[in-house]
Regions:
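Alpha-helical transmembrane segments of multi-pass membrane proteins predominantly involved
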Residues: 1-256
Length: 256
């Protein structure tokens, strides 16, 4: 039995993801050992975002392929990584006074924003449905918790529950659609799927068509696109104001 070759992994191309993950965990650990003054957590979070933005420019010979082509760093993904880091940094800065006033536990708050940024970076560089699904779920789970981070606020709890239930509903559609597309094309890579569709004209086949429809429905719910946006007003109203601003910008751009 021949051994399965390991996919090529370029750690430099993964630098923004690794940096954000490390700093997200660093924020959580630091929060356990400091007193009431949590200002150092803001500094750590912003430093992590700055280093991630800088590290996204570490590769000059673009595009760079990793994980057997499932993760691609090109000029577009570098641009969006920079945009995501800026939007996350702004979300942290506008949250400082709000968190103090509302008594929010900032360790979890800042780390979740960093982990959400990890998911957005994955989405911007993904060329495989499995990687896309992974990025979407990292973003979604982070936002579920951020929406309900005001645990004593009933509106925040309601927003988090609605967001979680509808998000799980959308995930089911998304995953089922990806499964049908994989069954029709035999691949999860977007480039191969596009090639199979163009060469074999299978877009009109029932299995493929149903997969595309379910995929559109799942993405529509995730990005609050019409007519799948009915959950957005209630969730945006109940979530903390800085979280609402963050949800309306970065994750939407990443999904699109």
């Amino acid at each position: 039995m021949e051994p399965i070759p390991a996919p090529a992994i370029d750690l430099i191309s993964l630098a923004p993801v690794l940096v954000l993950s490390v700093f997200g965990m660093m924020v959580l650990v630091t929060d356990l050992f400091i007193g009431k003054d949590k200002s150092i957590l803001v500094f750590i979070s912003l430093t992590g975002l700055l280093m991630a933005a800088i590290s996204s420019f570490a590769k000059y010979n673009l595009p760079v392929f990793s994980f057997n082509g499932a993760y691609v760093v090109d000029h577009l993904s570098v641009f969006f990584t920079f945009i995501f880091c800026i939007s996350s940094a702004l979300a942290i800065l506008v949250s400082v006074d709000f968190n103090k006033r509302e008594g929010i536990k900032v360790g979890e708050y800042y780390s979740l924003i960093l982990f959400c940024t990890v998911g957005m970076v994955l989405l911007a560089s993904s060329t495989d449905m499995i990687m896309i699904f992974l990025g979407i779920e990292v973003v979604s789970i982070s936002l579920y918790i951020l929406a309900g981070i005001q645990r004593k606020n009933t509106k925040s709890n309601e927003a988090a529950l609605k967001y979680f239930l509808l998000g799980a509903f959308a995930t089911g559609f998304l995953l089922y659609g990806m499964t049908l597309i994989y069954g029709s094309t035999g691949s999860t890579k977007l480039t191969i799927i596009a090639k199979v569709i163009s060469e074999n004209k299978i877009l009109s086949e029932p299995l493929m068509l149903m997969g595309v429809v379910l995929l559109i429905i799942g993405f529509g719910f995730k990005v609050a696109a019409v007519p799948f946006h009915m959950w957005a007003p209630d969730v945006y109203q109940g979530a903390p104001t800085p979280v609402t601003a963050f949800m309306a910008v970065g994750p939407k751009a990443a999904s699109l």
